[in-house]
Each structure stands twice: as structure tokens, then as C-alpha cells.
Amino acid sequence: MKDKSVRKELERQGYRFVGNLGAVKICQWAKKDLLDKGKCYKSYFYGVNSYSCCQMSPWIICENKCIHCWRAIELDMNKFIDKKNIDNPKEIIERCIKQQRKLLTGFKGNAKINRQKFKEAQEPMQFAISLIGEATLYPKLGELIRELRKKGKTSFLVTNGLNPKVLEKLNKNKQLPTQLYVSLNSPNERSYNKWHNSKTKNAWKKFNETLSIFPKLKTRKVIRMTLVKGINSNMKDEMVNDYAQIIKKANPDFIEVKGFMSVGFSRDRKGMGYDAMPTDEEVKDYSVLIAKSLGKPYQILDEHKFSRVILIGKEKSKMKIKKNEV
């Protein structure tokens, strides 16, 4: 990164840079789990260990500037980045683990730490490729996922869905992650453009292309929704059927319906303060409407009240990740 002020601001927030374009940061749930004070909803839903999760990204740039994003979308990363210097996948993984260990060093002297978890956390076995930016812009994403799989590590990739050709290539080369997420926050083109502020031409069209190929991608698939209320509401009753039609087209295994949290940079945006945060009951009520509109086999499978997340899916027995799905 060329601009030291941007780098300094992100490091102040807990980010650590790996190579030219990658970053890693310790998740709050990883810290809580090390102290036996709680686990991420993904741990409850899918069986991955929060304390052994590495939250990272190989590419800190994103095409969108979503209004609900807690990341530093106001900072134009493009002018500070040398995109010609592409990081090596193996080196990214090694550096992420190295930085993760450094960030965890302070826990070693904590008398309340779970020693066994701390020991296992030195070699993270779950990589959440979702920290910042859009990972499908990273030209060597397939190699990165393949390296993680070779090491027996699970990988969760979150994408904005604007690069369908990348996903098709990952599918063709058998380099899809353990679990693939596509973010769905708008039920129509008008709402989508207002919500995402994308730099990509025909973003709504490309997003729908991704949804169209989603059913044939050979991995566990999730649609992730973030609900916001107030002047930027994307959880109106009249939107439910449109959401359901979009989800049916994608035919995911699961739908995570999350309540917006006013944290990070999102707090400073108009209409995105604490009043925009739906309660866990409001999230659940809206999830019930979506599940009802989807119809069978979709149903409410689980919930994590603290995180305000509801899981909709087809089969409860398929929630936990099996060894052959890594």
C-alpha cells in the first residue's frame, strides 16, 4: 500500500497487512471463544471453531460502496494500491497465520485463557475470506482455496456476486470454497443501485448472472441477507415476495438473515445509526415471512439471538460441515 495514512488508519482498527493487497484481523468471536465466553453463529450452525478461524482477505479493493458496510468504503483504495504486484497464494496463507499468531500473543498471559484452544489457534483451520474488499477480484483466488484445501483447512468465501465468470472458473477447476456466500441486500434494480453504489457497469445484471449459475456450483451455498430498518429499509413487507423469487432462482442450501449492526464506518452514514438496527424479534419475524414465501423444503433451521441471525434452509441434518466437504 502506497499511502501510509490509509494503512495507519486501518492498522489502528486492528487490520494487519499481508503482502501488497492482503489483510487479516482477529474477529471478536475468536477472542471470546478463547476465553470460553461465546462462539460465532457460524460455529453453532456449521461446526467451525471460532477460536481457530482466520478472518482475512487476499484483496482489499471492492467495486461497491454499500451503505451498510462497516468497512472504510469512504477511503478510495484504488489510488493507493499497486495492482500489478500480485501476492502469491502460499505466501498470503503463511503471512496470515504469522500475523494471526502475533495478534494472539497478548492472550498468552491471560489466566482466563483456554490453553488448549490457544494452542490450536496457532494453526487456524478455518479461513473466512470476507474481511475487506472483494476476493473474487484476486487473480489467484482458486490457487489460494486449493492450498487451503490441501492443508485440510475449511474456507468460507463471501462475494458480492459481480464476477460470475470467476465463480464458473472456480467451479470448472474444482477450486470452490467449502462454503460460498453471495450477499443479497436488495430485491430490485432500483434499490440495488441505491444500496450498493457500484462502480461496475450493469452491476444488477451481473449479480443476477451469478444467481443464475449458483445452482450448478458444486459446493455448499448460502445467500446472506443484512436487514436494515428506517429510511434505508430493505425489510419492507412488500419486498418479501421479490426476495423469495431471487432466492428460488439461486436455489441455495441456506439463507442467513442477519440484522444490521451500526458499527465501524457505517455509523457515520445518514440513516445508519442505532435506529437502523432491527431487533432479533424483527429479524426473526421477517425471516418467517421469507421462509413462508419460499415454501417447502425451506424452513427456519436455527437462530443465534445475540448476533441477530436466523438460518433458513432445506435440511437441518446438513448444517454441520462433514470431512468430505472441506
Predicted regions located by residue number:
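Long, charge-rich boundary regions
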Residues: 56, 95-120
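Flexible, acidic/Gly-rich N-terminal and inter-domain linker regions that tether
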Residues: 1-60, 64-68, 72-102
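Short Gly/Ser/Thr- and Asp/Glu-enriched loop/turn motifs at secondary-structure junctions
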Residues: 51, 122-124, 304-307
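C-terminal accessory regions of radical SAM enzymes
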Residues: 248, 280-326
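Accessory C-terminal segments flanking Radical SAM cores
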Residues: 8-11, 15-19, 37-40, 53-55, ...
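Conserved AdoMet/S-adenosylmethionine-binding subsite of the radical SAM
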Residues: 108-281, 285
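Short catalytic/ligand-binding loop motif for oxyanion handling, primarily in non-cytosolic enzymes
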Residues: 65, 75-78, 189, 263-266, ...
